[in-house]
A protein has these predicted regions:
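Short sequence/structural segments immediately N-terminal
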Residues: 1-118
């Protein structure tokens, strides 16, 4: 997995260059972006991540529950392994999520994603 805490924490967590290089040592290694990544790893410098996906403060999203439901990362993040530069592949809005829940037969209960003042 690319993200260190995706299965265990509220947030997926952002990897650092050495973790990225575990795969990228042999994948797209001639790409200028991956070369910069390798340099960060070699120099043990933190990566200047730019967050691509955000949900509103009133929405709770659990990567862990989606992983346990066997939802593929690519369902929202696309074919990351084929990208030189990452971009937001899917919207982080209610319509996108509800459409996916309907396709997968997942619950549509409001309290899965929203705190209802209980």
């Amino acid at each position: 997995m690319c993200h260190p805490t995706v299965a265990t924490a509220e947030r997926a967590g952002l990897p650092q260059a050495p973790q990225c290089m575990l795969c990228h040592e042999g994948i797209k290694r001639q790409s200028p972006v991956i070369r910069r990544l390798a340099a960060h790893s070699k120099e043990n410098k933190p990566l200047p991540w730019v967050r691509l996906y955000r949900v509103p403060d009133f929405v709770f999203f659990s990567h862990a529950s989606h992983l346990s439901a066997k939802t593929a990362c690519a369902s929202c993040h696309g074919a990351v392994e084929r990208r030189d530069v990452l971009a937001q592949e899917a919207p982080t809005n209610m319509k996108f999520c509800m459409d996916c829940h309907r396709r997968q037969g997942a619950s549509l209960a409001c309290n899965l994603c929203h705190e209802l003042g209980q």
